[in-house]
Amino acid sequence: MRSLHILLVFTASLLASLTESAKADSLARTVSVVDNVKVKSRFLRAQTDEKNEERATITLGDRVVSDKAATKDLLQQLLALGTPLEKVQKQFLNIPQMKTFAELSKHPNWKALDKYERMQWQKLKEGETLTFMRLGDRLYSKEKAQEQLLRWVAQKKPVESVYDDLQVAGFAHNTVAARQNWRAYIMYDKWFTAASQMQRNPQQYAKFGTGYHSEQKTTELFEKWAMEGTHIKSVITTLKLNGKSASEMANNENFPALLKYVKLYLDFKPVRDLNAKSRLQARRPIS
């Protein structure tokens, strides 16, 4: 808590300094935001656990302060103030001008800069459905991308195969597909890892509706829903997984149940198609 307090105070002082350029310049000289030479010094860490995937690490003298919530708050407030990307890059992230994207993407603070750039774009395109993932010529919103990724997890599609399909190998070359698909790939990697490690009590398998349900009862309900064609999106809401981040979903007690439903939904598709065909034929007039 003390670390969080220190970081929040530091954040407030940084934001206040934006309104007075002289103070901002002075602050930039006296307070170092992460030395990019030290491995431990990162604004957004590349290696963290599932619950702390995104945290600020800012050096205050000999101290290192780190907190996920303050990172998000700092970037959001910088965005609200309309802080230019170049100023965030130089003053707050200490990232010098790079000649190539490959050099930039190797900088320890690159992920923070990339996140801020995405936030700016989303603000500019507020109200529009933004592309979260691209497969060939097909574009996916975040919601549709999540559904497709869940299908792959349920089918146990290898991470390496998804890596190839999303063309994220081109990330170092700044290809359009790689930049659009990087977040989708990270999301899939988290979900696939969680799926391979998850364990559930068969007597308290899923929590929804009236409370906990056994695996047997859950399966019976899910089979009925899958037969009826209840959409995956609806079940995500029923399991109270809507609106959660990829990490929050992966760590939620209902995530195994969601994957079970996705698999059943896919398995029952031939049955649904057959029933739909039968209903269509039954409605045709007899000649």
UniProtKB/Swiss-Prot annotation:
Region described as W1 motif: spans on this chain: 115-138
Region named Y motif: 246-267
Recorded GO CC terms: extracellular region; host cell cytoplasm; host cell nucleolus; host cytoskeleton
Keywords noted in UniProt: Host cytoplasm, Host cytoskeleton, Host nucleus, Repeat, Secreted, Signal, Virulence
Subcellular location: Secreted; Host cytoplasm; Host nucleus; Host nucleus, Host nucleolus
Residue ranges, annotated region (W2 motif): 148-171
Ranges where the record places region W3 motif: 221-244
Major localisation: secreted
Highest taxon, organism lineage: Eukaryota
Signal peptide positions on this chain: 1-24
Statement: the UniProt record of this protein carries the keyword Signal: yes
Motif window: RxLR-dEER: 42-55
Domain comment as written in the entry: Oomycete Avh family proteins have a modular structure with an N-terminal signal peptide (SP), an RXLR-dEER domain and a C-terminus with a variable number of modules that consist of W, Y and L motifs after highly conserved residues. The C-ter of Avr4 contains 3 W motifs, 1 Y motif but no L motif. The RXLR-dEER motif functions as a host targeting signal (HTS). The region containing the W2 motif, in combination with either the W1 or W3 motif, triggers a necrotic response in potato plants carrying the resistance gene R4.
Protein name: RxLR effector protein Avr4
